[in-house]
Amino acid sequence: MIKAENQKKRKPFTAQDTIPYKEIYKDGICRTDDNYYSKMVQFYDINYQLAQNDDKAAIFENYCEFLNSFDSSVEVQITFLNQQVNFDEYAKNIDIPEQDDCFNDIRKEYSDMLKMQLSKGNNGLVKTKYITFSIKADNLRNAKSRLERIEASVLNNFKVMGAMAEPLNGVERLKILHDVMNMDTKESFHFHYGMVAKTGLQTKDFIAPTGFDFRNDSYFRMGQTFGCVSYLQITSPELTDKLLADLLDLEENLIINMHLRPIDPKAAIKSLKSTLSNIQKMKIEEQKKAVRSGYDMDIIPTDISTYGEDVEGLLNEIQSRNEKLFELTFLLMNTADNKRKLDNIVYQTAGIAQKYNCNIRRLQYQQEQGLVASLPLGMNQTGIQRIMTTTSTAIFVPFTTQELFQGGEALYYGLNALSNNLIMVDRKRLKTPNGLILGTPGSGKSFATKREILNVFLITDDDIILCDPEGEYFPLVNALNGEVIKISAKSNDYINPMEVNLDVIYHPEKYRINGDVEDIDTIIADKAEFITSFCEVIMKKPQNAELNGDEVSMIDLCVKDIYKKYLYNDPKPENMPTLQDFYERLNFYAPDKPAAQNIANSLQLYVTGSQNVFNHRSNVDTQNRVVCFDIRELGTTLRKAGMLIVQHMVWTRVSQNRSRRKSTRYYVDEFHLLLNQPQTANYSIEMWKRFRKWGGIITGISQNVTDFLGSLAVESIVGNSDFILMLNQHSGDQKILAEKLNISKHQISFVNNSNAGEGLLFYGNVIIPFADRYPQDTRTYALMSTKPDEIQT
């Protein structure tokens, strides 16, 4: 930042003259004066306000170290830009385009719902944060090398604090300046550096407004926009980190800038000692006056005594603690469409400051200098500074509430309970997109699951598979023209557990992906592993004992016999092996192999007995985009085997889709039931670990958190889940969840006696409280509701 006394600036005659930089280069370096250069970094919010006290203290300490990392040759500007954007343009981010199918009426209704939710929050107000650092250098080359070193340090410091940050290039810096100075126009910024050479114009010509008017002493006009720059007068004896947060919560156009100039420690100590010496002289003079006047010489004016104590304390902090001194200029720029609205916004802003015993003062006859200091260029010509220590400066922690609003195939998860902003995230962007949806009965768990399924169906081409133990998903599945497969002993829907993907045989080249090869050998190996797990379930050994070596070997031998004969002899779907083939092969070896006889005896019930539902070739459309396995009527005898078979069918589908570069989403309700048995638990763990690599996204849904957390598999499941939607929880489960997921008491309060559709969203390292109040007067609500009087059949 360039101080006013160093400026010999001619009076500006054009709007471009008011914008005080010489040049902004392609790499983002800005030359503000002959010897001053700056760079700019955008950083993103973290959940400081929601963090545990220990985490808050760590962030604060790291931020203090960050401020102390700047020496007196680097001047810093921290910018908070809250800017209203055109709602219609912003709404395009969530618009769901029509497609050539029969679901456009649902798309329109869902899209309208999103726009309605968008209007509830302040998502039309885009909040961004930047840091600009400036240095003095003889030339661009010297400036560039040093600015890049500072930039690397800045990025690393933000990483330590857990905040994402990225440097801005020249076009990005110009766009920010354009948007700040052209709030009255809906025109987007279109610029590339080739336009400078083609048009003969300068970069300022592409960002300048139609004009500036600084004739009034307390406000200005920028195009058709009215603006006012004020400064924060810090009069409170003790500051709080909530002051800045409350100012940034103001749902109006607002630009806050903190200009920081570190003071050299030696110079600061020398200055303070000099000041202390002057105070001592003043004390001596006062004591002499007291003696001459005949009263006690120890009685001196309170202000001198207090001033001396303050200076001594400040000197002690610098000498004995890791404190620096900074010259701080805290500026606020409000803008509005008209003067009356501007005055109201300034009044609102002042009210927030007064709540914390501080004042907002308009810059009188300095509005132009205030505007320049409000642009992220690193220039401060106001001449208004306040000396602050590192700790007192760091109380303006630049973090408040993290938002999650992504574009592309992002899905809706409600509104941020702290800011009321729309939450839109894409699980595919996570390292491990597997997830959990946890909640007590009535918490909105099933509704949240169905809402995600519907959202996935409407905006992606992902395949969707559901395991439905309660038979509650069929209204939604039917509405999406999906396939509901009822699995029970009396059902006429059949799925063949011996079925394999013949496409591997017909088109082997499709299954060579990233060094992985799927061929006949891998098909047989995978099927042998599955049949082994299946036999472990049906043989019901005491204390869930595993199969012995002879039994495992016999299964492997029989499976190889069956599939080598089938796959190497022009395989056809109508000749697909069934459990009957496996049973017959076991009986072939049974006379000489007791292990084969044992397995065959256990298998007989499922082949020729009353539970032979799985001894048929498939007669349902397992290739439908939406498939729901309804296992509600699956009896106790078949339930474990049935759930294992469903898992295997899902894995086969994931394998097929991988070759098509297509994602598969698998939703498992009552997920804790799978973890009760070693076979299904092990299979689940394997899926959780391998799904991502194969293009699968698995979601476990559970209302019985106690059983889920008590499973030995929970560590592997949670460790491979970067997405958790946590709704209301029983008090006993809250403590366990807080320990497992390392969340604070304040965070856990959002799932304590919370209403339906409210809770915590875990997305990677981000934790956000959410609330979803889905409009009930819609067709989609009726499809997703699980309330008895609202269920649509």
What are the residue ranges of the model-derived segments?
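P-loop NTPase motor domains
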Residues: I46-N47, N53-S72, T79-Q83, L248, ...
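Conserved P-loop NTPase
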Residues: L741-T793
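Extended, folded cores of ATP/NTP-driven motor/assembly subunits in large transport
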Residues: M1-T401
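A short helix-turn-beta junction within AAA+ P-loop NTPase domains corresponding to the substrate/partner-engaging
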Residues: N481-I485, A713-M726
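Hydrophobic anchor at the beta1->P-loop junction of P-loop NTPases
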Residues: I437
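Hydrophobic positions on the alpha1 helix immediately C-terminal to the Walker A/P-loop
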Residues: A448
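Post-Walker A helix-loop "phosphate-sensing" segment adjacent to the P-loop in P-loop NTPases
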Residues: N455-I465, L480-G482
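Conserved lysine of the Walker
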Residues: K445
